[in-house]
Every structure is written in structure tokens, then in C-alpha cells.
Amino acid sequence: MGKVEELHARHILVDSEEKAREIIGKLDGGAKFEDLAGEYTADPSGKGNGGDLGYFAKTDMVPEFSDAAFALETGAYTKDPVKSQFGWHVIKS
């Protein structure tokens, strides 16, 4: 059996596309992802750790999230918000 590919990522979860786009704008302007996660994320587990999700396999997350996260270059973040059943995500690899 082959090794399962895993990815380390962070995310910021918000309730609107507009808010997610605002966060992406702040990142484009040089804001630190971890700081924005602490300020904005609706994910309680991400508030105190900069949105850190640790390592996960593609099958551990909903497809919309995994597809976007696994497509990122290391250190990059999504330039468009990612919609899932939980809300809108900004993801950083």
C-alpha cells in the first residue's frame, strides 16, 4: 500500500465571500496570515494557533477545501475564497 500524501495548511473561516475577499486583500497588502486568522476565523480551533490545521490527507477534508489546498504551492494562499458547507475559507499551504 502506498504512502498517503499529506499537506500542512492553515485556514481562515468566515461567513461571507466579501469578508474572505477582504482578508485576501489584507494578505496581498502584506498582513501576516497567522494574525488575520486570530482576528477573523470563525473556527474555534484556529483562533489561538494562527489557523493551523496541522497535517492532513486529501480525504480528511471536504473536496472543495482539499482540492484548493493541495493545488497551492508551499507558502502560497488562495487568491479566491473557497466555499464549503462550513462557510468561506482562505487557505495557506
Task: Explain the meaning of each model-derived region.
Residues A9, E22-I23, Y55, E73:
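Residues at structural and domain junctions
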Residues I12-K19, A42-D43, K58-M61, S93:
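Solvent-exposed coil/turn segments that connect beta secondary-structure elements
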Residues I23-E64:
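Peptidyl-prolyl cis-trans isomerase
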Residues M1-H11, E39-Y40, E64-S93:
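Proteostasis/folding factors centered on peptidyl-prolyl cis-trans isomerases
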